[in-house]
Each structure stands twice: as structure tokens, then as C-alpha cells.
């Protein structure tokens, strides 16, 4: 009897345990997956979200079983790992392990673009990228000379629901003869993944290729291998682009609004958590965060109690007006980590407040975003208003100014985004001559600071003030000679004597671009400074701006052979240049204007109240611009100058103004600077040719087209000696001869 009771009790106990496990076993945690990462450590990192706890309780609102679309579905960690492993099989790729440096050592940093395949569609944005590369100094049409390869297959939009999606890309890429598992290849991408989770799935194995990708996460980003680029719209200009909207600084730097945002709310799904919580910090006064539920075709099926109020308030405000009148602009994540709001805020000089955990910010390898943005945390949304209010006005002003620099240097056009990407890769390849962080984050930026010239900041005129360096105490005169020496009274000989008497002259270089042989050494005047005669190889106009090794001084006095300048005028121009070492300083001024009737740019030599160019027939500038002219400008523009034997001075002014964003500096009232006795048969008489002036009009528009806009800046300033024309004794004046001219 006792045994039967024991058996019965054991049986009931076992049945009860089985029933308990069956009914409640779903809540018992199982062993961790082998590939899962512990979150015990590093819980304060902003790029890791809070742990996700599933709610076993029933929802307060009844579930509508008629909804066939599950907006809150989330793929499992295993599925996410599978997706990432299929896309990032080269997860551990770095330049040292997945890049062949030997391809770059043979021919330098050259980029090859695959020929476009017949029948393949290419989006306008991707065509802009390819056109930029093909028009850059990095491009080569010979794959045997290439260091980096770019696909002609459109990889920008890899959302399977997009009409721009290219099908069968995996097969097409693998069939490329030069693919080599993606080694030394660069892939551009703006959109990846699709509804509902928008994973970073490109739909094909990138192998060992580098990714230039928008909205890339820090989890998938391969440091010093991939490049994070900004998300830009198809309307983003290919070249040029509008300048930043900051016209002047206000002190204190506060605007009408402290913090603004206007955008979609995303009722459900990825990206909705933060945007659904914005109403908690919205006060409709200085913090205006507006969202609308009107997104997608079925938004009304998922609207909540706040939607009607949010939609009504959303329509009351103009987005552009908010953008231009706010101190800070909130940039929360969307469906993907990046959004168009980022570039819009930069251009508007509205300091971005980043609220997108885990986003690798654009060009983070070289740009210090702490100097231009506020990096927030989605989990600390309620602290954002108090955080931005605590920022001192000096810091706000510095942040605002840096947004304008970064926008104009790297983001205002597709061309700048692409060239910045290529320059970053080039710095990795040529580490011995790479740019410093100061070059990337200071005016004029990395695109205009070529490390092939020098990686030392003190060799570039833009950093003299920052480093406390004084400009060069001497100059080198470069005289462009195009007519033979037939008389000892020719203007070039008088010019050499006059320049050589300057106390600041280190040497004189005569660039012999004449068809006649070089004159004998004794034909040149005896001077206290050395005279170096260089015979141009091709005898073309662009040769006057070659970075000759003989240029030992930073300052270059550029002169035409028929220029008439006294020693006093040379001295005064040089002393003025020492105060403006990054600009062109000189005598002959010209201007540009917009012709409304012809709808084109015009060139004028009329004496007006302003000017935008100082011609290089009598001007001083830094020798670095010789290097930029030769190595930065495309061969198409230089070939045009050489064929016309004209416009080289205009092109140099375009280049310097594009770099500095400043006008040149004219000195003294002198307007005529040419020798009138030059023979009409000489090549110098081209100034009297009516076609010469017409050609310069054509050049203006050709140059403006390549620069993507008009870089020239007008000025109404002219610098004269302090006592110029003053009613004092002539003996008290330092540059007394200038008044007699």
C-alpha cells in the first residue's frame, strides 16, 4: 500500500512538472548563441541600444487581425548575422590585407572606370559620380595603369523595391575580368536593404572591395578601409553647388529658434522610436520639433491619437524659414541611419545635433565633427534641450563657422564628395605625403592642400597666421619673354634693371618662350642678383606657371616682358603682398559681369568702381599656385589656354579665388602698365587684336563651367602708401616716386 502511494505521488509530480514546462517554458532563457556578444561591458557606449525585452502582456489596444502586414517584425540575430556575413565576407579587410599597393607604385594614384555596358541603365546620380572621376586628374583609361577600379554598374540604390535597383548584379560583377574578388575596387552606395529592416545588404558579395557608403553603421564599418559618405539627393549639383547661407556673423549668435526639426514620424517600424518621442521636448516656442504621420499609402491604418494634432501643427510652419532661423537643427535617424537633413543643416549654418546612434559620420577618418556638430544619444533625448542651451555662445559661433567651411569644402556638390573620397584613399596609399588633420579641418581644406607639394603647414600660405609665420622676405621675378632681343632699348631689359634694384629681389628668371634662339649671355644687363634663363620646352602660355625648381622663394613676381614698373612700385607691391600672402597682389585690374541679354559671363577692362581680377602681367602671388595650376587644373583647360595663347592670367585668377574665396588686391592708382613702343609685328601686340578680347569672353564662360560657378569675387578696395597724395613734405614719404608716375 505504501509503495502504491509513493508511485502515485511520483507520477503526479512528474505530470505536474511536464505541464509546468509546457505552459511556461517560453520564458526560460536558453544558452547564448555562440556568435552573440555580451553587453555586460561597455553599457555606456552610445552606439549600442538598450537591451530589448519582449512584453508577455496583452496590448491595451485590441489587435486588428485584418492587418496582413507586420510593421514590427524584426529579424533574429542569427538572420542578421547571416545577412552581414553574406555582404561583408571581407569584414576584417584593411588596407594592409586587402589592397595591392604595388599597383599604385608603378604609375601613381590612378583610377579606372569600367566601360559602360550596352543596355545597362545608370541613374543620374551615379552618372555624376562617374563623370566626376573621368574628369579628374586621377582618371586613366588604361586599366594597366590603374591603382583603383570603379564599376560602371550602378550600385547606388540597392533597395529591391526601388525602380533604380539593378538586378542580377552578383552575376554581372563576378563576370568582370578585372574583378579579382574586389581587390583595389571602390563601390559607391547610397541606399541598401529594404522594408522592413533596411539592413546593409547590397545584394552581392563585395569581396575585398572598399565601400564608399552612406548610412553605414560603426558595426559594419571597416576603419581605414571603407569610407562613410553623406546621403545626398538626385538634385544635388554635380559641380560647384551653392555656397553656405551664412552671410554674416551675429553677436550673440542666437537665432529665433534654439532647436528645430520637421519631418516624417514613422508610426511603426525601424527608425520610429526616436521620432515618436520628439513631442516630449517640443515646446512650440524655441524648441520646435514637428512630425507628420502622413507617410506611405497606409498611414491612416496605423495613425494614433496624436496624429491629427501633429499633422495640423506640422502644416503651420515653413521648413526653410525654420532652417534659416534656428541655432541648432536636430538630425535624427530615419529608416536608415543617415538623412537629407544632415547636409541641409550644414548648408544653412544650423549646427547639426546628431541623434543617430551607431552612424559612422561622413568622412569621419579626416573630419573632426566635434568642431561642427553636437553628437547626441537617442537614449538621452530628453536631455538634448538642456545640453544645447548650455553651450557657450563662443562655441556656437565656432561651430556655425565650421559648418560653412565643411559644406563648401567637401559637401556642396557630387564632385567634392567623390574627390574627397579619392583623396582619402590616396592619403592611405601615399602615407609618406599624406595630409594632416589641420589641413583637412582648416581653410581651404584637403582638396586644395596638395601634400605632394609639401606636408608641412608652414610651406602653404593659408597657415601663416595660424602658425605665426612671417611670409618670405624675398621674391623671385619671373619674366615671360616672347620676342627676340634686337635692341638694347627693349622694355624687357629696362624691366630687369628696375626689378633687380629692389631690396627684396632674390633672383630673376627669364622664361624664354620665343621662337628665336636664346640670346648670348652678354646681351643681358649686369645686375646684383642672379639672372636665370629657362627655355620653355613647348613654348606655350601655361609654361609660365610651371613649378620650376629654380623658384627658391615663396613669393613670385610675375611679369610680362613689356611691363613698365619702377623699383619703388615693385617694393610697395611686395610689402602689401606680405600682408596678404594667400592672394594675388598687383597693378592691372579687370572685372567680370553677368550679361543678362546674352545670359553669359562677360569680361571688361573698363575703369569701374570695383574689380575681380589682377592680371599676372604685373602681380605677386605665392609659388604654391604654380603647383596647383599645373597639378590641380584639368588638362582640358590648360590645353585651351595654350591653343589660344590667351587667358592664362584669367585662369590663374579663377584658381586663386576658388581656393581663397577672396578677391585679389590692387595697389595704387596706376592703370597703364604696358610699354607702348612694342612693335606691332611682335607677339606682344596680341592685346591690340580684337579677337584677343573676344577669346577672353569665351574663356570666362568655359572656366566658370568647369568650376561649377563663378569663383571670382568683386572688391572695391585699393591700397596706396599711407601718405599718398597727402599735403606733407615729399621727404617724409617712403614711396615718394609713386606719386610722380
Curated annotation (Swiss-Prot):
UniProt feature coiled coil, ranges: none
This protein's cofactor list reads: Mn(2+)
Q: How does it sit in the membrane?
A: Single-pass type II membrane protein
Q: Which UniProt keywords apply?
A: Disulfide bond, Endoplasmic reticulum, Glycoprotein, Glycosyltransferase, Manganese, Membrane, Metal-binding, Signal-anchor, Transferase, Transmembrane, Transmembrane helix
Q: Which residues are glycosylated?
A: 84, 325
Identify the EC number(s): 2.4.1.224, 2.4.1.225
The record lists Mn(2+) as bound by 562
Q: Which residues lie on this side of the membrane: Lumenal?
A: 29-741
GO MF annotation list:
acetylglucosaminyltransferase activity; glucuronosyl-N-acetylglucosaminyl-proteoglycan 4-alpha-N-acetylglucosaminyltransferase activity; glucuronosyltransferase activity; metal ion binding; N-acetylglucosaminyl-proteoglycan 4-beta-glucuronosyltransferase activity
Transmembrane stretches, start-end = 8-28
Q: List the disulfide bonds.
A: 647-699
Any one Gene Ontology cellular component term annotated for this protein:
endoplasmic reticulum membrane
Q: Which residues form the signal peptide?
A: none
Q: Where in the cell is it found?
A: Endoplasmic reticulum membrane
Enzyme class, top EC level, equals transferase
Q: Which GO terms describe its biological process?
A: heparan sulfate proteoglycan biosynthetic process; protein glycosylation
Q: Which reaction does it catalyse?
A: 3-O-{[(1->4)-beta-D-GlcA-(1->4)-alpha-D-GlcNAc](n)-(1->4)-beta-D-GlcA-(1->3)-beta-D-Gal-(1->3)-beta-D-Gal-(1->4)-beta-D-Xyl}-L-seryl-[protein] + UDP-N-acetyl-alpha-D-glucosamine = 3-O-{alpha-D-GlcNAc-[(1->4)-beta-D-GlcA-(1->4)-alpha-D-GlcNAc](n)-(1->4)-beta-D-GlcA-(1->3)-beta-D-Gal-(1->3)-beta-D-Gal-(1->4)-beta-D-Xyl}-L-seryl-[protein] + UDP + H(+); 3-O-{alpha-D-GlcNAc-[(1->4)-beta-D-GlcA-(1->4)-alpha-D-GlcNAc](n)-(1->4)-beta-D-GlcA-(1->3)-beta-D-Gal-(1->3)-beta-D-Gal-(1->4)-beta-D-Xyl}-L-seryl-[protein] + UDP-alpha-D-glucuronate = 3-O-{[(1->4)-beta-D-GlcA-(1->4)-alpha-D-GlcNAc](n+1)-(1->4)-beta-D-GlcA-(1->3)-beta-D-Gal-(1->3)-beta-D-Gal-(1->4)-beta-D-Xyl}-L-seryl-[protein] + UDP + H(+)
Which segments does the topology annotation call Cytoplasmic? 1-7
Q: Which pathway does the database say it acts in? A: Protein modification; protein glycosylation
Main location group: endoplasmic reticulum
* Matches recorded under PANTHER family: ACETYLGLUCOSAMINYLTRANSFERASE (PTHR48261), EXOSTOSIN GLYCOSYLTRANSFERASE 1 (PTHR48261:SF3)
The family annotation for this protein states:
Belongs to the glycosyltransferase 47 family.
Functionally, this protein is described as follows: Glycosyltransferase required for the biosynthesis of heparan-sulfate.
Q: This protein is called what?
A: Exostosin-1b
Q: What species is this protein from?
A: Danio rerio (Zebrafish)
Identify the gene encoding this protein. ext1b
